[in-house]
């Protein structure tokens, strides 16, 4: 493939990918049949009837078979976005799908514990690999820079800071940014300056410790929340003529969406698990609103319902018009998950038509340059 991955057209602002995982031990124990296959690196073929071999085909920008490794997925889905971030654009990666299909494996992965490069590390997920690539590119560029990260959790429509330094786990509030149309601010959200990928793993581990996890019938350590890991890069060009200065601000949002499974599968028919049912309702409401927002953008409606969920308010700037987006859905091959797999694939098919205009967040601002320069010097 080209170094641009799949994103060959400059104006193709959203791309949709699917990653099919192998049958896991739970599915083998349940004698689950494999009913999903990947053909030609773009097509997902689902056998929807065991009796008469009826199949349905879905086509995406790229489909990854079970044998696809972490490096291959990253090179196609995320690596092309890093160039955009370094040029001062906003980019977003969503991981979407049913609980237990590999979203967290795809986004976070595992720490190999050695000094492997981002191009070769066999286990790292999208978040640490993206930061490794960013640092590599920044080190060889003729710019002064700072890299900051934040890690936000949305649980039952409440916002929590996964990197908060205090023991206070109070809820955060979100406000409209009056200085920038279509942007919101999460008041009090911690932003931490990072310098290398080792720090990133430490910070992510810190965030995971604070993260709310809950058992479901499908995954003993399933997350019942959305998480948003945001990387903001401030870059000051050094190669411009004397008297001219340019600050570029690039942003990469890495969003792990909570499991999209239905309430009955999550065990809510048991009265003791009503909290799980409440979680599912909130999760599905967030995902439904996200779909409605994207539909409104596709159809150019004058009103886009960002405010109908906290998730879409947080991501408003990432969906509105100054960003490139990759959606990677993870799916199970098992016939017992067929309903959820079909729901995921149909949801994704709707999103493929979404296109937005793209605007760089380059800024010529003397006072801002001075502030960033001071931070770089510190």
Swiss-Prot record:
GO biological process, one term: mitotic spindle assembly
Principal cellular location given in the protein's record: cytoplasm
Residues bound to ATP: 97-104
Coiled-coil parts of chain: none
Subcellular localization, as worded in the UniProt entry: Cytoplasm, Cytoskeleton
Origin superkingdom: Eukaryota
Keyword presence, Nucleotide-binding: yes
Single GO MF annotation: ATP binding
Tissue specificity annotation: Testis and ovary.
Function: May be related to mitotic segregation.
Protein name as it appears in the record: Kinesin-like protein KLP2
């Amino acid at each position: 493939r080209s170094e641009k991955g799949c994103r060959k057209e400059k104006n193709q602002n959203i791309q949709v990918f699917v990653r099919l995982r192998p049958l896991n031990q739970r599915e083998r124990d349940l004698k689950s049949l494999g009913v999903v296959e990947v053909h030609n690196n773009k097509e997902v073929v689902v056998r929807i009837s065991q009796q008469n071999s009826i199949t349905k085909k879905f086509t995406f920008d790229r489909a990854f078979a079970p044998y696809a490794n972490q490096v291959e997925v990253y090179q196609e889905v995320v690596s092309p976005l890093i160039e955009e971030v370094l040029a001062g654009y906003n980019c977003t990666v969503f991981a979407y799908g049913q609980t237990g299909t590999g979203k967290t494996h795809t986004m976070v992965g595992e720490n190999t514990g050695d000094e492997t490069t981002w191009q070769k590390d066999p286990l790292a997920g999208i978040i640490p690999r993206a930061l490794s690539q960013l640092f590599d590119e920044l080190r060889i560029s003729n710019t002064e820079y700072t890299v900051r990260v934040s890690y936000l959790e949305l649980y039952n429509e409440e916002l929590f800071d996964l990197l908060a330094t205090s023991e206070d786990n109070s809820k955060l509030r979100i406000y409209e940014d009056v200085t920038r149309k279509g942007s919101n601010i999460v008041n009090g959200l911690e932003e931490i300056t990072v310098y290398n990928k080792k720090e990133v793993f430490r910070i992510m581990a810190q965030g995971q410790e604070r993260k709310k996890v809950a058992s479901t019938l499908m995954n003993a350590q399933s997350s019942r929340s959305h998480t948003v890991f945001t990387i903001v890069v401030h870059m000051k060009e050094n190669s411009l003529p004397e008297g001219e200065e340019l600050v570029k601000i690039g942003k990469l949002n890495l969003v792990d969406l909570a499991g999209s499974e239905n309430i009955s599968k999550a065990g809510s028919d048991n009265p003791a698990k009503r909290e799980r049912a409440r979680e599912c309702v909130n999760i599905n409401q967030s995902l439904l609103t996200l779909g409605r927002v994207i539909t409104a953008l596709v159809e150019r409606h004058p009103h886009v319902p960002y405010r109908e969920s906290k998730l879409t308010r947080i991501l408003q700037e990432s969906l509105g018009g100054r960003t490139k987006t990759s959606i990677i859905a993870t799916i199970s091959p098992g016939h017992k998950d067929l309903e959820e797999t079909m729901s995921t694939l149909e949801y994704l098919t709707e999103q493929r038509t979404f296109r937005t205009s793209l605007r760089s967040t380059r800024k010529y601002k003397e006072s801002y340059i001075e502030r960033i320069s001071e931070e770089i010097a510190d």
